């Protein structure tokens, strides 16, 4: 099997899982990662900066790295595969699950999954023209009835899919709502000959434990839960959360990598949402998030990180100082 048991994977996230993002995930304990989702039309027409999307690190050359193709035009998928064949990846995944409107309105991603016949035609084209191990990622097609999703999965497996990643929400649910564990479990039990990776709603160690228990899948893909929290991989495997200094170093190193890749102006625009994710849920004052929204220079990030002290810690310090009788020294 292409995936061993009991592994965690980083999902292909458009606009996020570039090389610096993946390197942050590796430092956080990830071992199986995908590049950003790659649009077939952009590759076919040589537009959209495909080279940077498909860059590999030295670690990835020696270990595992995969990419994912999205599209609904058979001819463009064929041409995109010709371009992808110039690169080295461990596998090529086909996207049948992206619910983002700009993808869905083109009949691709989760919308393509609804058109099973054409979805299978597109996947067959990819398997025919790419030189990589083919896999697919999809969303469940109906929340109560597993039959349509099983039909799609059966067709993909018959065409040679070596693994399936299943997001347990429908296209309409987007990234909210309850994950349907039962349908993921039924897919895993129906196709025991291939790895089935469970996906959707994993934001914590407890979420991952629930996903594994309820679906029977030992392989789990992390997506939004890993945004700003690359340590989630090691925490799920029993490791400790980051210290404040480790957190600061991770953010600084991540954004520094982006500056090297894109140049400071472009990198800092991209970095705003990344830094927001790193700040989320850690008790930092809202003023830091406001500053993250307007970052333009790496030096501004350095100042923000220097000022990043969780509100609870600030409150504790104030109480201690007040009791010592030197409250007047506080700003």
Pin down the residues of each PLM region:
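Hydrophobic faces of well-ordered beta-strands that scaffold small-molecule active sites
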Residues: 8-11, 33-35, 65-69, 92, ...
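Short secondary-structure transition/capping segments
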Residues: 44-49, 104-107, 147-148, 176-178, ...
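Short beta->alpha connector loops at strand-helix junctions that form conserved
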Residues: 36, 114-115
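Alpha/beta enzyme core
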Residues: 24, 78-92, 96-108, 117-194
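Glycine-rich phosphate-binding active-site loops on the catalytic face of alpha/beta enzymes
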Residues: 36-40, 95-102, 168-172, 201, ...
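Short glycine-enriched, charge-decorated loop/helix-capping segments at active-site entrances
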Residues: 107-113, 237-240
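Glycine-rich, positively charged N-terminal anion/phosphate-binding segment
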Residues: 2-4, 13-83
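Alpha/beta catalytic cores of nucleotide-metabolism and tRNA/nucleoside-modifying enzymes
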Residues: 1-9, 14, 19-20, 121, ...
